């Protein structure tokens, strides 16, 4: 979406109907049918299509669709095999890459004329309701093209997903006579999860903790960066959660109820950064002294650059000995392409370091 806005390209999406059933089975499979087949009961049926439920059906459909994209001239990228690219040219002669992004049976096409490109896929696969349209929802997130300061910017928000998750949890709590707490921040002030000595949960509540963390993790994937750190911390206790950990998960949902809206703007503009500190002065000298043989490693078989260039920026930080029991630190980072966040992450470090300097070098 960043590249689309940056290069003046359009987006179109489609959903393949009965996706697996379009692909041939990759294994020799058969079944002995039951009474529901009438006179054929007890007969041996040979399975020729990648039926839902077969272990290899997902791989069979993926390979079948990949073959179609390859015939169209698209090439799978080295970094992500489900991102396909093809060199395109605008009427004015400007070169760019067309992209097709695949997530199981969801297709997203980025091109100057995406309907023509995605229509070639439709020649072999039937789309649900024969619909090819700009994306509105993708994997639970609402996608919109908005104007900001005279620039078209793609956005994604998890508002609908969050509201549905909160409402579902409130219904479950209502059956127990409980309510979500009102919260102004994701985690209660002063709560230290590793020092919590409340009772351990039974099997039922243990499963509830795992389910709630799964729901929250997907909300993070859809842009709720503001709860990433807190959910990461509580995820450490999924093996043996306590009552206090469950209550803190309720606290996070209470925070989401109070703050359901958060929109990420994938701004294609290049950030204004002062890099002179790395080019001259004492900092540059220090880097040269410590990394005198350092060279930029570029991937092999890189495709020819086409379209406008982008700048990748990473912001990184780590605590030191934040865990009061293990003395382990916690790492967090956000990676931007131009001014659009694309990756955000928070995790506990696997080893213990003696200084803040060393903890900043670990993931």
Task: Locate each region found by the language model.
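Long, low-complexity, charge-biased intrinsically disordered regions
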Residues: 1-363
């Amino acid at each position: 979406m960043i590249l689309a806005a940056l290069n003046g390209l359009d987006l179109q999406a489609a959903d393949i109907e009965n996706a697996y059933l379009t692909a041939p089975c990759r294994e020799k499979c058969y079944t002995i049918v039951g009474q529901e087949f009438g006179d054929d009961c007890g007969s041996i049926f040979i399975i020729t299509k990648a039926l839902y439920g077969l272990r290899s059906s997902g791989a069979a459909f993926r390979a079948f669709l990949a073959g179609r994209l390859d015939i169209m001239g698209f090439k799978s990228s080295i970094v992500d095999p489900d991102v396909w690219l093809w060199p395109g040219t605008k009427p004015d002669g400007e070169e760019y890459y067309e992209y097709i992004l695949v997530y199981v049976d969801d297709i997203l096409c980025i091109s100057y004329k995406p309907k023509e490109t995605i229509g070639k896929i439709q020649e072999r696969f039937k789309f649900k309701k024969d619909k090819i349209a700009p994306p509105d929802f993708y994997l639970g997130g609402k996608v919109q093209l908005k104007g900001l300061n005279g620039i078209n910017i793609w956005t994604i928000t998890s508002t609908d997903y969050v509201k549905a998750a909160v409402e579902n949890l409130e219904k479950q709590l209502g059956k127990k006579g409980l309510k979500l707490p009102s919260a102004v921040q994701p985690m209660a002030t002063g709560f230290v999860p590793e020092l919590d000595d409340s009772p351990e949960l039974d099997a039922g509540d243990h499963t509830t903790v795992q389910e709630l963390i799964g729901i929250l993790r997907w909300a993070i994937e859809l842009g709720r960066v503001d709860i990433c750190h807190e959910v990461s911390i509580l995820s450490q206790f999924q093996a043996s959660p306590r009552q206090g950990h469950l209550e803190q998960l309720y606290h996070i949902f209470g925070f989401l109820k109070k703050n359901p809206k958060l929109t990420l703007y994938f701004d294609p503009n290049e950030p204004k950064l002062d890099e002179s500190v790395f080019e001259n002065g004492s900092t540059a000298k220090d880097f040269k002294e410590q990394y005198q043989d350092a060279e930029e490693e570029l991937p092999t078989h890189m495709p020819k650059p086409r379209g406008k260039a982008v700048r990748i920026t990473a912001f990184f930080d780590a605590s030191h000995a934040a865990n009061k029991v293990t003395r382990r630190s916690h790492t967090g980072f956000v990676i931007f392409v131009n001014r659009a966040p694309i990756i955000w992450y928070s995790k506990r470090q696997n080893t213990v370091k003696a200084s803040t300097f060393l903890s900043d070098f670990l993931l």
